[in-house]
Amino acid sequence: MGSVGLLGLLLLRLSVTASGSGAGTGSGTGSGTGTGTGQLVGSPATGPALQPREPLSYSRLQRKSLAVDFVVPSLFRVYARDLLLPPWSSSEPRAGWTEARGSLALDCAPLLRLLGPPPGVSWAEGASSPAPAQARTLTRVLKGGSVRKLRRAKQLVLELGEEAILEGCVGPSPEEVTAGLLQFNLSELFSWWIRHGEGRLRIRLMPEKKASAVGREGRLSAAIRASQPRLLFQILGTGHSSLESPTSLPSPPPDPFAWNLTWIMKDSFPFLSHRSRYGLECSFDFPCELEYSPPLHDLGNQSWSWRRVPSEEASQMDLLDGPETEHSKEMPRGSFLLLNTSANSKHTILSPWMRSSSEHCKLAVSVHRHLQPSGRYVAQLLPHNEPGREILLVPTPGKHGWTVLQGRIGRPENPFRVALEYISSGNRSLSAVDFFALKNCSEGTSPGSKMALQSSFTCWNGTVLQLGQACDFHQDCAQGEDEGQLCSQLPAGFYCNFENGFCGWSQGILTPHNPRWQVRTLKDARVQDHRGHALSLSTTDVPTSESATVTSATFPAPMKNSPCELRMSWLIHGVLRGNVSLVLVENKTGKEQSRMVWHVATNEGLSLWQWTVLPLLDVADRFWLQIVAWWGQGSRATVAFDNISISLDCYLTISGEEKMLQNTAPKSRNLFERNPNKDPRPWENTRETPVFDPTVHWLFTTCGASGPHGPTQAQCNNAYRNSNLSVVVGSEGPLKGIQTWKVPATDTYSISGYGAAGGKGGKNTMMRSHGVSVLGIFNLEKGDTLYILVGQQGEDACPSTNRLIQKVCIGENNVIEEEIRVNRSVHEWAGGGGGGGGATYVFKMKDGVPVPLIIAAGGGGRAYGAKTDTFHPERLENNSSVLGLNGNSGAAGGGGGWNDNTSLLWSGKSLLEGATGGHSCPQAMKKWGWETRGGFGGGGGGCSSGGGGGGYIGGNAASNNDPEMDGEDGVSFISPLGILYTPALKVMEGHGEVNIKHYLNCSHCEGDECHMDPESHKVICFCDHGTVLAEDGVSCIVSPTPEPHLPLSLVLSVVTSALVAALVLAFSGIMIVYRRKHQELQAMQMELQSPEYKLSKLRTSTIMTDYNPNYCFAGKTSSISDLKEVPRKNITLIRGLGHGAFGEVYEGQVSGVPSDPSPLQVAVKTLPEVCSEQDELDFLMEALIISKFNHQNIVRCIGVSLQALPRFILLELMAGGDLKSFLRETRPRPNQPSSLAMLDLLHVAQDIACGCQYLEENHFIHRDIAARNCLLTCPGPGRVAKIGDFGMARDIYRASYYRKGGCAMLPVKWMPPEAFMEGIFTSKTDTWSFGVLLWEIFSLGYMPYPSKSNQEVLEFVTSGGRMDPPKNCPGPVYRIMTQCWQHQPEDRPNFAIILERIEYCTQDPDVINTALPVEYGPLMEEEEKVPMRPQDPEGIPPLLVSPPQAKREEGPDPAAPPPLPSTSSGKAAKKPTAAELSGRVTRGPAVEGGHVNMAFSQSNPASELHKVQGSRNKPTSLWNPTYGSWFTEKPTKKNNPPATKGHHDRGNLGREGSCTVPPNVAAGRLPGASLLLEPSSLTASMKEVPLFRLRHFPCGNVNYGYQQQGLPFEGTTAPGSSQYEDALLKTPPGP
């Protein structure tokens, strides 16, 4: 922009201030992004009147500069037409259904703020943004000319003025604002251009051309930019929503052959105009684009804010040490900023938004430094959408007065602002600023703002996806339209799953013996997770070394700056002694350039399909892909590729900002060109060409420089003249003497840094302190800039050209020793210590901030009389959060660190201060000029003691000038970005070095060391001494050595004697051990077979139920004698059902029980013989608790058998299994309606409420009312629900489970707040749990509080949160739940009231006619794993159940909806029907982490029982490693009795504490009902366990884990595993 434009901008700002209105554009950007206190510099409150009109030529120039241009590239039209718009065809009329729409939209709020309210209308400031409404289309879209002419020109100019704003935003009625957007309808233009047009489409939006007051068009242009103009395009088909179609109209069905894509073009950074500046200079003599906080005041004496003060006025002020003359010498009379405050505050100067295209961009601020500063300056870099960072300000040398603070900004990727903060400390703080500039921020031409073209894909249900998510073989839309027929219509190669052939992939010239790529189905058993065809190559049939190449179709060039990606799945199965590469070949002009984008080299593949997404960067021409596989001898592998797709973003999306990308593609070492006329198979001989030359390395030296200052450019040019190095040496600032080097290629490099040695002392010239070496491995990318400072050796004290000093060196002058003898210290004759060695630094720049990679510390200087046995260990730091400080200085200087400041001349400087070496101590220079300076790299200067070495943390120097105290070495550093290859070692005796070379990966070698043969370019592994390389080239074997041969007779005699002796000793030992063990086993067996031995301690005492008053039955004492003893002879065990909390659970029969049929089917719970006393107490306690109850809704205890071992508890056999599994199994599904109705769920809830009422009336608190603890008599009609698990009540009954601070696991999701917060348990606790049980019943078995952990449930419930009703849950039922969940216990109803309300629900037609929710997905395990606590968590490690795998049920899988996403690695098993499961025992997965519920069956007739008993003589023994037990497995016959049909009515429940069931209901229970399974249960065989095997079962809670307080849960059973467990015998469950 010329001077006229700048003058116009200045007049525009003046007019905005004078008129008191504007667009609110801070810093001239037109977006109002400044701070709330922002104000333009030099904008007076009042100003002179301006001319009412401006020249036409000036107005036209200004209008052109303030326009907003939208340019859509012509390639977008070409690609959209070819990919999305198939030509019209009468045979395929669907192609004509595609529509193209377009519009240009602006927000009305900024435009209306500019105009102000119209006459008669008043709206508040917050109402300037009208409520959203249907966007209005302007009737006058185009200005001048015809549509035909504009189409021919492919350019549209839209002028926006007050009338258009009022028409589009306010409407015809000015009393009411109706539109939130102002839109131009461009559908006709865009539709013509996308189908028939040529070239690019350009749309220019500018202020209306009218003569008006100065600044009017500028304000209007700023308002237009603030309204965020954006261009919207849409290509859609019939049935899709449109940009302009009303949402209330019904849409026709979607077209599966038409796209629904949307594009939005807008400025990447709307707050930046195209006039964004790349530099700024403000001397405060004229108005500047700066903002202030607090605002600037030119008039008055505002002590709390900035003021612009002329220099002549400052000379008249009575300011303490204030500035009297202006810093700019070229202007004798000028102005500067002044701040005079007495408060502790922070004042800020903020720059406008800037950009930088140069690494040399810096901030320069001229301030006045006072003798006694009372504040400090801090600079902040504030990039867009990034956190700010501090800019290091370096002042010019000087004590006080005007000085320039400079800080490096660099080249930030995003636009940025710079804030200069002055932090005052009170006491009349004074600040003066004369100059504020951003310099050297432009490099070449400055690009304008970038328009981003963002694309999206809209699903049929309205879900919006990024365009890159479409056609990527991952279904994101609900109906899969993003992966449907649309993708199959793309050109060949864009979307390829190889189901219809090669998809455009082809091979070169094939011979009969050459391997070839094939499209086939993989039949290997290990890769059956993939179905369908794939592009595969087999190396099994090719014994020799070979290669194979397959080439894709040719793809057009992607859009410039597009996020282009390649997606593919690949697999390597077997042993591949070679590599596979994916090469991108770009068709450059006259040649083809190839580069590798993906590479894998492996010995043995994982045999798993892997998904890879590869960015395709910097592709500017047509390209194709090549898959190249090479293998050597011994390869037996299958290489396969599938689901290869090119993202549509490559051709239909444009990123707004042209990012300064380096090579961010995957590691690519091969970059070559070939002639298109040559053999089109360039990769056949690539194995013979080295990927890189391992002998090439880059050695960086000091370039011949020495002393405290680094080398110059001329020195390094001369030093590296005949080498492969090319460096740039800094000449000023902190980078002076630092060499910069660009990485030639993306690769892994080893960087060896060597610090410089320290100087020698005057008397000890035999040994110096060595520099430290550090070697690290780093991944570097092509174009990365490394900054390398090579440390220089500290200066030696001797020899010297000074004669007096030379005499001291050779021992002819002993003045130093004399002073030491007299004063015991050195002061007058100080000197003679060596300077500290400089450190070697290798670092990078990230956003202008140095980031260290490797720092090799320098050695400390030796003292004048240093001892020879001094040793300083190496120190290494790898934490960048540790401050890199300078070493402590005394008479000698400490070493320089990474980032610190020092004012001592003899101290070494830190890297950010320039890293120069320190001078000698002043006394040494003054007395005899003994100069022992520190080396470049932060070495400290010497005195009589040695100087400290440089490093990340500088080495310390002696504090008292001890002539025997050496300077300490610095601290080395390696970045966490790298890998430390060798530890820090002191090795360097001179100057430092840096050696960079390619790192050869030797991880496949046994010794992790290898080298590459320079002739054959093969990697050869090294072996340790005494071993040689095996034939496989990887392993090391001991080298065979010839041994002396002994006579054969002697060898035979020795071997025979040794064998006989060994056999005799072994036989004797076996006999002795066997006899001893046999005697021990006999004694133990006799002792264990005595029942009195185990019951002696139990018979002498009784168990009191008064431990917990809540469990007391009228305070009576219960003993073993109260239990009904059943003789062992009357008990017959039929088969094993599973493993319970104490031991095995069996199905059995008992006879001779009064008032019961004989034989009676029962469940027998066993207690193994070898048990702890605590287990016996638990076993008996549970028997006592269950025996106390006598109710039809509580599982009945038939009796016990305790007089013989093992001990038994006989319980009522429940064939229906647990309630939770029943609900989950009977969920209705689309192809499987449920046999349940809402009335069935109410009856189940009624049964459980009856049992709870009985417990409540007997003052018994269950504490764990949950669906998993309720059992059903049968799964069919007539079922009765009963409470069947009192494990938790048993533990609380024992008064040890709820001990404070223990490892107890509580059912948190079923507990009220007072229970888990205060430990209060009442009958209202069971009321709360019953409400959760109701939620489980009516959600059909879902886990309460879905997706919440126990901790989250605690916080949710205590904060007042409650669960939402389950799907299709009737309102009256949910009201019962909410009443049970009242926070105050007294507000919860008792079970009599709950029963009454459930009864009402059973009579309500609206409730019982409610349909159950339908499950549309496969059943997924949403249960949480419930770890349990053993009795002694400190002594017993957690034992987890690991049951054997069950066999899959044979038969075809039923039709099911598509699977839902799941994180479980297991697969859902087929769910058998009830008829199929009758008469067989099944196993289900551990869905509740240790609570695997029992399933019982009563379908075995008497004849079947005799068959089972008669077949015990031929068992098949199976060892169960989980429980250490033997099971006897025997196949059984399936008996499928028909289920009795019909639904029996339920009787009314009593309200007096006991619930009765009518006789007809009891008689209707199905005794032979089929077995109910877990949701994913598998079929298993019946098992029978002889009684004598029960003695060897372990006891205790072996299948429960526990958790120490504060530790995470351990995993339980593996997915898909199964086990048995008795729901009656479970220990207290977890949530």
Curated annotation (Swiss-Prot):
Cystines in this chain: 703-716, 798-809, 921-943, 1002-1010, 1005-1021, 1023-1036
Group of enzyme by EC: transferase
| Free-text description of this protein's post-translational modifications in UniProt | Phosphorylated at tyrosine residues by autocatalysis, which activates kinase activity. In cells not stimulated by a ligand, receptor protein tyrosine phosphatase beta and zeta complex (PTPRB/PTPRZ1) dephosphorylates ALK at the sites in ALK that are undergoing autophosphorylation through autoactivation.
Pfam families hit by this protein:
ALK_LTK_GRD, MAM, PK_Tyr_Ser-Thr
Q: Where would I find glycosylation on this chain?
A: 185, 260, 301, 340, 427, 440, 461, 579, 587, 643, 724, 823, 878-879, 901, 1001
Give the way it sits in the membrane: Single-pass type I membrane protein
User: Subunit comment for this entry?
Assistant: Homodimer; homodimerizes following heparin- and ligand-binding. Interacts with CBL, IRS1, PIK3R1 and PLCG1. Interacts with FRS2 and SHC1. Interacts with PTN and MDK.
This chain's protein is named ALK tyrosine kinase receptor
Q: Organism, per UniProt?
A: Canis lupus familiaris
